[in-house]
A protein has these predicted regions:
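N-terminal alpha/beta PP-like core and its mobile active-site loop of ThDP/TPP-dependent enzymes
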Residues: 1-220
Length: 220
């Protein structure tokens, strides 16, 4: 939550005015400039919802001075949030899941890599059950550490520049790589485009913008 000059002066470049919503646009999920004090309950409810849902991230609420001084006669916290332009996806695509299972059945050297997204969706138990059922070795990014117990016989350690030889070698040797809740960032994979040549890459992430961003994906 940030402070702003009086609403009537926004955009006139007065003393201490800053276009904070514009400046923060590249690193927040959403920005609000509060125009009326009566909108504060709705905006705060929406801001918390956007920040915590889907892929979590910061939401900026900019409050002009006159709005800060105004009185909200009846503060009513909205029961529901209805945002037409923000609909995070949680359910998997059945057709794509079938492709994943078909690729897994044909694979001889599969590997499952878990990222921080598995923790955020509290999916560690599902990952563990899936790996055990199909006997798939598991590695993790730094943010994914803990999705599998470190002493589990299927766990091969952390991937990346700060990871172990076994985990990094497992990706090189695999013919099927399942990335769950990981961004494929440079700290985990230095050259993903080259690394995944000749492999089937499955990328699972709640944020569609991350899928295929850093490497060509076979099954999104």
């Amino acid at each position: 939550i940030t402070g702003q000059v009086n609403s009537a002066l926004v955009g006139s470049d007065v003393f201490q005015e800053a276009d904070i919503t514009g400046a923060a646009e590249s690193f927040v999920k959403y920005s609000y400039l509060v125009r009326k004090a009566g909108d504060i309950p709705r905006i705060l409810r929406e801001a918390f919802y956007i920040a915590a849902s889907g892929r979590p991230g910061p939401v900026l609420v900019d409050v002009p001075m006159d709005v800060q001084l105004a009185e909200v006669k009846k503060f009513v916290w909205p029961e529901e949030v209805n945002l037409r332009t923000y609909k995070p996806t949680y359910k998997g695509n059945t057709a794509q899941l079938k492709k994943l299972m078909k690729a897994l059945a044909a694979s001889r050297r599969p590997i499952l890599c878990t990222g921080g997204g598995v923790h955020l969706c509290q999916g560690a138990g599902v990952v563990r059950a899936f790996a055990e059922k199909y006997n798939i070795p598991v590695i993790s990014t730094m943010m994914g550490i803990g999705t599998m117990p470190t002493q589990h016989p299927l766990y091969m350690g952390m991937l990346g520049n700060n990871g172990g030889m076994a985990a990094n070698r497992a990706v090189v040797d695999a013919d099927l790589v399942i990335m769950a809740g990981a961004r494929l960032a440079d700290r985990a994979l230095s050259n993903p485009t080259e690394l995944f040549k000749g492999k089937t890459l499955v990328h699972i992430d709640v944020d569609p913008a991350e899928i295929g961003k850093n490497a060509p994906v076979s099954i999104p």
